[in-house]
Amino acid sequence: MSRREDGRLDDELRPVTITRGFTTHPAGSVLVEFGQTRVMCTASVTEGVPRWRKGSGQGWLTAEYAMLPAATHERSGRESVKGRVGGRTQEISRLVGRSLRACIDLAALGENTIAIDCDVLQADGGTRTAAITGAYVALADAVTYLAAAGKLSDPRPLSCAIAAVSVGVVDGRIRVDLPYTEDSRAEVDMNVVATDTGTLVEIQGTGEGATFPRSTLDKMLDAAMAACDQLFEIQRAALELPYPGVLPEPGEPAKKAFGS
């Protein structure tokens, strides 16, 4: 089999690194790297829930995604300066939130909110899938922090791990984890979010250049699930290390929260 432009096999991920404790203030903070794509993912805890959630006894998890102006080859203006959030940004923010809510028991949080922030420092394809993969680890650290503070009714509210990967058809070949040079010319482009129990959370797929048969879809899903299995191993290895910071004592006011 001929190799890709970057030397990888079709089913091979780019080098993936997950660094916990990347910043000190949030309960969970991760730098995730998929090759040259780098995303900072944080998980912050705040008391209270959205108005429509009040009185339910359940918590909430929300997510925001953004790209730094110089994350790509050409600088893009900050959306905060433009005065409105773009459609792509809203779509990815909602995707990250949906993906992580699939793995957590919100009732265990009480009426508290975990806010996930994913900021793309450098983009080379697959930013949304990198964000989801890194954000899960940040969420796991935030849960560890809340459990240590005695804030959870269930100390183990995470039912599974969540990871995501891009997969596409490029030059007629199914390839995983597409960098920008491949993503920009893919005939079929897909993002797959999965759990470590073998189930799917979300599939986003498009025939960019042409239609594609069901058999291709099945092969793409097989390739994506195999790649996610590798990502789960990387997540587990990262989370085997001790919590990257000082955990609170039960009953002690949580310091890693908004406004602290």
Swiss-Prot record:
Pfam hit, one: RNase_PH_C
Catalytic class of the enzyme: transferase
Database matches in NCBIfam families: RNasePH (TIGR01966)
Alphabetic keyword roster: Nucleotidyltransferase, RNA-binding, rRNA processing, Transferase, tRNA processing, tRNA-binding
EC number annotated for this UniProt entry: 2.7.7.56
Keyword Lipid biosynthesis tagged: no
MF-aspect GO terms: 3'-5'-RNA exonuclease activity; tRNA binding; tRNA nucleotidyltransferase activity
UniProt keyword rRNA processing present: yes
Protein name: Ribonuclease PH
